[in-house]
């Protein structure tokens, strides 16, 4: 390229009547100019990823204030408030698609709520301000603040009901099918990973509904990790290179299932899900039947078939997602918050699906330097 290509040249500002100013940007060929909008979009999305990490950090700090105080609802409310405050500072046109409930059930972060400044990309957002409210209230491990963001229409708009989940990492992608018996799935996963069943590790929620399944897996020789709560964190571990967890199986919340689907899609793992009515999970009494019928009606209204196997692409339709999780209490995935006076440290897992970049961010927060509305929630 000739030397004059690097000489300053005039750039005309957009403002009418302004005089040209000087730029040291070289004159790009036409092909490069056509690529600039994509590059700008890419840079903007990277900046958004950091903004979303600030959202989960703030929610985690707000929840931590109520750590071990036995009040899971107050802890969750504080995290919801903090998450909403921070989301509304981000330059997005965001819609909550997985949140704290319907508009008549939740004052904030309800399904359909608009968040962000209204400027910027139109995105759908799945939130779980505290994944593990009971664990936070009791001071137990593995509580997180979680958020996933995707393109408009990316996520399944799942009702707040139960979901059967089967999740594996990239090494076993394409080998799972909830239409098959669990034992067949475990054998297929073990074969794909090149290990015997005795070396396969499955994580499952330690709930009475899983007692028979746990016994079945152990009889097969599978190693079972039964955890009290927190299947989003456990699902991520199936895809982490340094984790010994191979499979997550069990029945948990459908909203958490969609959040898991987002991060599993971002990490190139695989997942099947199946929506289940309450009376099919908790027992067929009058109250459970009443709630279950309402859930099934909601599914029908949303065009979703309960009981049908959902593939990963049904729940997260693109890998162009950003996922952020900040630890509240120490767990298998993340360190918890530590605080001394007005100084707190956090660890955040930040994942960009398009580039499949995984970052662990350790931050130090001077809490008395936060915005006044945040100080009320975290100090």
Describe each PLM feature range:
Residues 96-100, 125-127, 136-138, 157-158, ...:
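General beta-strand structural signal in soluble alpha/beta enzymes
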Residues 146, 151-226, 319, 331-333, ...:
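Acidic beta-strand-loop-alpha-helix segment within the catalytic core
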Residues 120-131, 135-154:
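DPxDG-like acidic metal-binding loop motif
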């Amino acid at each position: 390229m000739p030397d004059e290509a690097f000489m300053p040249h005039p750039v005309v500002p957009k403002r009418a009547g302004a005089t040209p100013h000087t730029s040291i940007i070289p004159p790009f060929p036409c092909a490069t100019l056509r690529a600039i909008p994509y590059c700008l979009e890419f840079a903007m999305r990277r900046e958004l990823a950091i903004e979303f990490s600030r959202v989960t950090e703030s929610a985690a700090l707000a929840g931590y204030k109520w750590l071990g105080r036995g009040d899971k609802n107050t802890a969750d409310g504080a995290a919801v408030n903090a998450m909403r405050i921070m989301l509304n500072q981000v330059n997005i046109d965001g819609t909550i698609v997985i949140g704290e409930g319907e508009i008549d059930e939740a004052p904030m972060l309800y399904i359909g709520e608009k968040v962000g400044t209204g400027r910027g990309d139109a995105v759908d957002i799945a939130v779980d301000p505290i994944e593990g409210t009971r664990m936070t209230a009791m001071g137990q491990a593995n509580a997180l603040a979680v958020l996933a963001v995707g393109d408009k229409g990316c996520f399944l708009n799942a009702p707040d009901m139960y979901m059967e989940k089967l999740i594996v990492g990239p090494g076993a992608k394409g080998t799972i099918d909830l239409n098959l018996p669990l034992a067949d799935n475990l054998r297929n996963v073990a074969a794909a990973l090149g290990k015997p069943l005795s070396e396969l590790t499955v994580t499952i929620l330690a709930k009475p509904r899983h007692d028979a399944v746990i016994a079945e897996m152990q009889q097969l020789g599978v190693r079972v990790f039964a955890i009290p709560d927190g299947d989003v964190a456990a699902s991520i571990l199936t895809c982490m290179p340094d984790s010994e967890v191979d499979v997550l199986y069990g029945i948990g919340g459908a909203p958490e299932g969609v959040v898991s689907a987002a991060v599993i899609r971002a990490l190139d793992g695989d997942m099947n899900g199946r929506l289940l009515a309450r009376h099919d999970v908790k027992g067929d009494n009058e109250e459970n039947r009443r709630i279950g019928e309402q859930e099934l009606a909601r599914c029908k209204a949303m065009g979703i078939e309960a009981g049908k196997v959902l593939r990963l692409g049904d729940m997260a339709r693109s890998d162009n997602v950003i996922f952020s999780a900040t630890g509240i209490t120490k767990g298998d995935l993340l360190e918890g918050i530590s605080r001394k006076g007005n100084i707190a440290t956090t660890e955040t897992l930040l994942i960009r699906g398009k580039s499949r970049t995984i970052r662990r961010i350790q931050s130090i927060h001077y809490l008395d330097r936060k915005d006044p509305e945040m100080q009320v929630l975290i100090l």
